[in-house]
Amino acid sequence: MTCRTRFAPSPTGYLHIGGARTALYCWLEARHRGGEFVLRIEDTDRERSTQGAIDAILEAMEWLGLDYDEGPIYQTDRVARYLEVAEQLVADGKAYYAYETREELDAMREAAMARQEKPRYNGAARDLGLPRRDDPNRVIRFKNPLEGTVVFDDLIKGRIEIANSELDDMVIFRPDGYPTYNFAVVVDDWDMGITEVIRGDDHINNTPRQINLYEGIGAPVPKFGHMPMILDEQGAKLSKRTGAADVMQYKDAGYLPDALLSYLARLGWSHGDQELFSRQELIELFDVKDCNSKASRLDMAKLGWVNQHFLKTEDVAAIVPHLVYQLQKLGLDVAAGPAPEDVVVALRERVQTLKEMAEKAVVWYQPLTEYDEAAVAKHFKAGAEVALGKARELLAALPEWTAESVGVALHDAAAALEIGMGKVAQPLRVAITGTQVSPDISHTVYLAGREQALKRIDVAITKVATA
């Protein structure tokens, strides 16, 4: 049987970090087993579902590179199918119409609580065989088995059992003509041939009800794997402030998608002591059965370390589009400065995020208007104009402008003046960037471009002369 997994977010908000991990695990399980991955949008909550949230989820999936073989499939396009299955259950005596008012249901639950029992529906209409009629309170309820136990072997948590006496006859179709969550997902999984359901353990209480529904409609029951939640660094539930942010905020913060996926994979799964994984390694090694049953903690410092590794080792061409995004976010004209791939080469060893890389690269994409006073005082001393002038002379004469040729010219300038390389490099660094901190001097000058580099050296020579 072909492995088929599904990621089924509700479009009531952005895709947060926990949802991204769920999507990743579902995707990896399918890819590892040579199966298929389905994206399903569970949008039957009409009051809370929004098109903006749908768009945000799709954008995040695309950025993460989690491609799907089928979908997106929208539950709101399948309401007629859900009703068809629900009415067949009624015809088969496995479900029934009920018409209690809100007040009657509240009284029913209050009476149960007064008896110190679990507040739930008491099955009043279960055996009445009421016909379908127009009524604002009309629902369809599933006849949950009255006896026996639901048993399933969770792929992550092991064997779980719950007595049917703990469950009531749940509503499967609401008065508004829409299916409930538990019913819609079961029909979807049946129709879509889902073989493994991997999701957060906040859904674990739904599983016994859903298993009874699968069996009630005559569908094969998929395997279930429930992942523990991700906690913040203090061990508390994630909040927006502590990391439960929109996945796209991680993009804006300058993380590479492959770095984020590598980090997320380790938040609940492991392969020996290995800390870093390429996308292909994850596909080859992942097995949901290897997931941990205990909650993981989000560690932003660790994520930064992982991202730094990927910036240093990933192909330059793969990093460039993400750097361009960051440069454009800063309002920079990318065409007016150095090639982004050259910026990556110059800065990849010096930064932890792409946002930091872009901020350091600003000096090469816009005019230099400010100088660090301490840098000027330290390096624009009398005599610096000689080193700057010699460097300018040799740079202007270069037949080809490359980082290598620039480096040779600067060393030649130092040799010609019989001074240390630092006597040339430091005033030149201030001349080009306005500061005394930058990548190696050959890349710093090269990235400015010949025209801008010579202009900035001329300005610096004037500043030294008038100091």
Curated annotation (Swiss-Prot):
Q: Name one GO biological process term.
A: glutamyl-tRNA aminoacylation
Show the catalytic activity: tRNA(Glu) + L-glutamate + ATP = L-glutamyl-tRNA(Glu) + AMP + diphosphate
Complex formation: Monomer.
* Keyword annotations from UniProtKB, A to Z: Aminoacyl-tRNA synthetase, ATP-binding, Cytoplasm, Ligase, Nucleotide-binding, Protein biosynthesis
Motif ('HIGH' region) positions are 9-19
Family stated for the protein in its record = Belongs to the class-I aminoacyl-tRNA synthetase family. Glutamate--tRNA ligase type 1 subfamily.
Database matches in SUPFAM superfamilies: An anticodon-binding domain of class I aminoacyl-tRNA synthetases, Nucleotidylyl transferase
EC numbers, comma separated: 6.1.1.17
Q: Please give the Pfam families that the UniProt record associates with this protein.
A: Anticodon_2, tRNA-synt_1c
* UniProt-listed NCBIfam families: gltX_bact
Q: Where in the cell is it found?
A: Cytoplasm
The UniProt entry annotates the motif 'KMSKS' region at 237-241
Q: What class of enzyme is it?
A: ligase
**The protein's name:** Glutamate--tRNA ligase
- Domain of life, per UniProt, equals Bacteria
Record GO cellular component, one term: cytosol
Gene Ontology MF: a single term = glutamate-tRNA ligase activity
This chain's source organism reads Stenotrophomonas maltophilia (strain K279a)
UniProt lists the gene as: gltX
> So what does this one do?
Catalyzes the attachment of glutamate to tRNA(Glu) in a two-step reaction: glutamate is first activated by ATP to form Glu-AMP and then transferred to the acceptor end of tRNA(Glu).
What residues bind ATP, as annotated?
240
Q: Check the record and name the HAMAP family matching this protein.
A: Glu_tRNA_synth_type1
